[in-house]
Amino acid sequence: GALAESELPDSSFVLRKIKGAAIYSPGGNRLDFKAQDPRASVVDRRLFDRAAVCEALQEGVEMRLCSPVRRIRREGEESVLSIGGGDEIRASIVISAEGVRGRLARQAGIMPPELVLSGAQVEVPFAVEDPESVEVHLGAAPGLFAWVIPTGEETARIGLCARERGCEHLKRFLGQEVIRKRILGSATTINVGGLPLGPPPVTVAQGLLVVGDAAGQVKPTSGGGIYPGLVAAKIAGGVAAAAAMEGDGSAQRLQEYDRIWRASLGRELEIGMRANRMLNRMSAKECDELVNYLAGRPRLIKTIEEHGDIDRPSSLMIKMLFHLDWDGLKLAGLLRYALG
């Protein structure tokens, strides 16, 4: 998982361990499952980033604050980064982890992610039903789904991602009776931003590697980006270091990064994109039928509880295929479509 991949010795940024989920269909049908062991962690992103920075500084990384990079250009065998105030930084290899906008990546000719959803989230005092389970509300907005993630016994993050106007969709979702009656006070934090889905065809250029949100390395089934971003960052660091030692910053040399990260993450991201498209094509009635079908199949629920993997969902999809009955033929077709 993401915590193991981070290799951070301090885990004080972990707010909550998650073992299960309650999935709601548009019509109110509900599917519950809960594993014996934690399957995900809720983290304070600011504390997580701080822990990562502290670890990097201890390893000798030089960090410059308040130094936004305006432009990148190539001069011979070096990349030149233009910093605000007229300063410049020269490097043989640059790793861009600049987030969803990916301005430097675009300047270098790297295409943007396939799709960028509009996301919005608030943290509020909330009547949490089960602090070890998240809530997933299907059909709340076209794009992904809405979520309720407990951060404490009586606080939760409520958010969603939509094709557009995420804030408007979230406002409507917060006004729904099933959510509104459980909100116990005003929002303590509000976050808005883009969620990139679908990596571009190439994530390298001469002297440049792109990682994380800028490269669309986000799980389309959950919207999580920490795990794939960490995996890709390690690969990028290794390839960049080797290329710099060789004095070869060509796009052809750096293509090794593209090959390795796609071998590790590419299939799961492709399956996730197909699953996302499939979910968005389903009508409210079809979502109701799907959730109702799963809720009435204890063997399938047990399979989900035993084999669910938020980082690599394809393994669960394959196992579910072996436990479907005749009434699950439609679900079998959907799973086969997602698996490709």
Task: For each feature predicted by the language model, list its residue ranges.
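A short, flexible beta-alpha/helix-coil linker loop
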Residues: 30, 38, 154-156, 215-218
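C-terminal helical "tail/cap" subdomain of flavin- and related membrane-associated enzymes
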Residues: 241-340
